[in-house]
Amino acid sequence: MSHFSTVKTKIKHKPQLIEALELLQYDVQENKELINPLDHQHEKVKVDVSIGDDIGFRLNQEGVYELVADIQTWKDPVPPARFLDKVTQQYARM
């Protein structure tokens, strides 16, 4: 069964996160629900920043953004770990 996973980041600032994603040529949307089409219960997760229907970032209780995605159905051509590295590097340049 497929489900959303979360990965902690060190990203704390939403405007810089959005700018980093846009500089990496991603189409950014804010305040969206991710929907897992392969989950029979149609799991939904609210995220603050998304770059598609199944990849996003949400602010956790510690004030840090975490990557939210279904790793099993990852569609981006860049693998998840490399994607997060690229976003983090671009964010650090802000």
At which residue positions do the language-model features occur?
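Interaction-mediating elements
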Residues: 1-94
